[in-house]
A protein has these predicted regions:
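Flexible, glycine-rich active-site loops centered on histidine and acidic residues
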Residues: 117-123, 145-146, 200
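Amphipathic, small/basic residue-rich leader segments at the start of a protein or domain
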Residues: 1-111, 122, 127-131, 135
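A short, Trp-centered hydrophobic/proline-enriched beta-strand micro-motif
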Residues: 139-148
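Short Gly/Pro-enriched turn/cap motifs at secondary-structure boundaries
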Residues: 151-155, 182-186, 199-201, 228-236
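A short core secondary-structure module
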Residues: 169-170, 174-222
Length: 259
């Protein structure tokens, strides 16, 4: 097949069809039967920003069933930590998962965890991988990606103003973030946080990414913000302030100015 033909060949591969079949069976047998009860339990919680124990029991049961048959971590195509599914085939599987509000999490394929795990797998140190990537890959914790800021077009990282200054072996972080998806989830333990570390460098080399445990002193979760009128509790889209947040120097990802 020449390059032009290859570029226009966007069908799911034959090799992925058995996997797609297994995903559909998993959703039918293990996800659909728990969905109604899962969301009904929202009405029994005293705190909207928490999970009902039964909700976590239902999720963990479906996750364990998926993991037992290898339906797990589809999003790392070139890593022995993933299922070896290429991006095109994964796109078809993701479309199938999107038909259910719970399916992607039961296969450990939910954002923002998927993107965060890819970053850690590619550029994390052995220590960072052991502390954060392993429990994420196992579906034991959740994570967030803290980039968006108030008042600026935050998809352009050059607009980020949250600062991180190195003092006595620690990064001291100050700033404010908006719409940080998943940061309200009680299971969220770590945030990959976009900061400005090198304000005097060329614009494209001023930004860095730092691992910030969400329970670090100075991390202030102000409120859940609304998207199209919904706050999506308990995962949420959170307004967060960083008030002299201190994390070890080794929490930097890849290197200063390489965010």
């Amino acid at each position: 097949m020449d390059l032009r033909s290859e570029l226009f060949e966007l069908s799911m591969s034959e090799q992925a069809q058995p996997l797609m079949d297994a995903v559909q069976i998993h959703i039918r047998d293990n996800v659909d039967p728990i969905t109604e009860e899962f969301f009904r339990l929202n009405d029994e919680k005293q705190d909207r920003w928490s999970w009902h124990p039964r909700q976590l029991e239902l999720l963990d049961g479906a996750k364990n069933k998926a993991k037992d048959i290898g339906l797990w971590n589809f999003f790392l195509p070139e890593s022995d930590m993933g299922a070896g599914v290429n991006n095109l085939d994964y796109a078809y599987i993701a479309a199938e998962l999107g038909k259910s509000p719970l399916a992607s999490e039961t296969l450990n394929c939910s954002a923002p965890d998927t993107g965060n795990m890819e970053v850690l797998e590619r550029v994390g140190t052995p220590e960072q991988k052991d502390k954060w990537l392993t429990p994420l890959l196992n579906g034991e914790i959740r994570s967030a990606f803290a980039m968006t800021e108030p008042g600026v077009a935050s998809s352009d990282a050059k607009n980020i103003s949250t600062s991180a200054v190195l003092k006595n072996g620690e990064w001291v972080i100050n700033g404010e973030k908006y719409y940080i998806s998943g940061a309200g989830d009680p299971r969220c333990k770590i945030m990959i946080t976009m900061v400005k570390t090198s304000p005097d460098a060329p614009p494209a080399k001023q930004q860095s990414q730092i691992l910030v445990p969400i329970d670090t002193p100075g991390v202030e979760i102000v409120e859940g913000m609304r998207v199209f009128g919904q706050d999506h509790a308990p995962k949420g889209h959170m307004h967060i302030r960083f008030n002299d947040v201190r994390v070890p120097e080794e929490n930097m990802l890849l290197g200063e100015g390489r965010g």
